[in-house]
Design a protein with these regions (language model features):
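Long, amphipathic alpha-helical coupling/dimerization segments that relay conformational signals between
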Residues: 2-15, 64-131
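N-terminal intrinsically disordered, cationic/polar leader segments
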Residues: 4, 8-16, 20, 28, ...
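Alpha-helical/coil-rich non-catalytic "connector" segments in signaling and regulatory proteins
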Residues: 4, 24-25, 32, 49, ...
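Generic alpha-helical propensity signal that fires on short helical segments
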Residues: 32-34, 39, 104, 109
Length: 131
């Protein structure tokens, strides 16, 4: 008799895998010369991520027809980055890395995810990153 694997939500996986996902984001970010040209410590470079992921996880757990709240953390992060010397294109690159790191985590754990809900959650992630 086969053991049935427990299905987890995207929000659950992202919450559980927060630290490895942030570590992957930092690794990818440190490979982009445009970003590393601004001298920041690893802590300064990724301090915004726990709150951004908390906002994303909260949004993933909302009912699908609920109007999403505005991410105050994302706006604050943009302001801080501007003060640190980031350009708009650098912020876009950070957002792209956020999305790729998030999807990489989901890919690693895809066997735990409900395929019927995955695509709609990916759409929420893409919308949140683009907001």
């Amino acid at each position: 008799m086969m053991k049935q694997q427990k299905v987890a939500s995207v929000a659950t996986i992202l919450k559980r895998e927060l630290q490895p996902t942030i570590k992957e984001w930092l690794r990818r970010g440190n490979l982009v010369p445009e970003l590393t040209d601004v001298p920041l410590s690893d802590t300064d470079r990724n301090a915004h991520l726990p709150k951004l992921y908390a906002d994303l996880i909260c949004r993933l757990r909302l009912a699908k027809d609920t109007h999403p709240p505005v991410s105050i953390a994302a706006a604050a992060h943009g302001k801080i980055r501007r003060e640190q010397g980031y350009s708009a294109s650098m912020l876009i690159e950070e957002s792209r890395i956020f999305q790729v790191s998030t999807f990489s985590t989901l890919h690693v754990h895809q066997s735990e995810l409900d395929p019927a809900k995955l695509l709609s959650d990916v759409m929420v992630i893409a919308d949140e990153v683009d907001a």
